[in-house]
């Protein structure tokens, strides 16, 4: 986006939210400045009247894009926000999808995105873990098993499609969704190195400045005991 037409972007986020991290990474890759507003999930701030008014799902992230000549755009689902950012940014920005001339590669990217965002994240997020706890479910084992199931599927596809990253040699939407899932997997005790393509791609992604600035350990709301410098 050109500076003269750049909208004001606000991201309601939580430092450890994988869905929020997707947008932090994407915004950084596309060099889109944004203002982060922290929503503390552990304190239940996502269920506050103020957050519900912005995000009826009572979740994060919420992306608000304010254009000079248009009504503000509010997007409350991370994948919809990623697609929106892809559509409003020029070709000269970092594209998160392969070119339209390669629909096959775009389909692979979207398949990998769906594995992380539909198969893994919804059943391992904090809200679901709280719901299953009264049934005596081992939350750690639940998360670990379901993450590993998703990683096996991702690995099988990415092993064929990967170059430097999950699909070819450019960072795509698949990688933007993969790395936050890897952070969550490590927290759940998954040995990510069991999935060699995922592990290799994640290691390379961690070297990117856009990723370092989006990392859960470098956010304004990251507690001091977890904080590291993004430099």
UniProtKB/Swiss-Prot annotation:
InterPro entries: Glutathione-S-Trfase_C-like, Glutathione-S-Trfase_C_sf, Glutathione_S-Trfase, Glutathione_S-Trfase_N, GST_C, GST_Zeta, GST_Zeta_C, GST_Zeta_N
Domain of life, source organism: Eukaryota
Catalytic activity: 4-maleylacetoacetate = 4-fumarylacetoacetate
EC category: isomerase
Keywords: Isomerase
The GST N-terminal domain, residue ranges: 7-93
GO molecular function, one term: glutathione transferase activity
Pathway assigned to this chain's UniProt record: Amino-acid degradation; L-phenylalanine degradation; acetoacetate and fumarate from L-phenylalanine: step 5/6
GO biological process: glutathione metabolic process; L-phenylalanine catabolic process
Induction: Expression is positively regulated by the cluster-specific transcription factor hmgR.
Signal peptide range: none
EC number: 5.2.1.2
Domain called GST C-terminal: residue spans: 102-224
One cellular-component annotation, GO: mitochondrion
Family matches, as Pfam families: GST_C, GST_N_2
Job description of the protein: Maleylacetoacetate isomerase; part of the L-tyrosine degradation gene cluster that mediates the biosynthesis of the brownish pigment pyomelanin as an alternative melanin. The 4-hydroxyphenylpyruvate dioxygenase hppD catalyzes the conversion of 4-hydroxyphenylpyruvate to homogentisic acid (HGA). The protein hmgX is crucial for this conversion and thus, probably functions as an accessory factor to mediate specific activity of hppD. The homogentisate 1,2-dioxygenase hmgA is then involved in the cleavage of the aromatic ring of HGA and its conversion to 4-maleylacetoacetate.
NCBIfam families the UniProt entry points to: maiA
Similarity remark: Belongs to the GST superfamily. Zeta family.
Listed name of the protein: Maleylacetoacetate isomerase maiA
Source organism (scientific name): Aspergillus fumigatus (strain ATCC MYA-4609 / CBS 101355 / FGSC A1100 / Af293) (Neosartorya fumigata)
Lineage: Eukaryota, Fungi, Dikarya, Ascomycota, Pezizomycotina
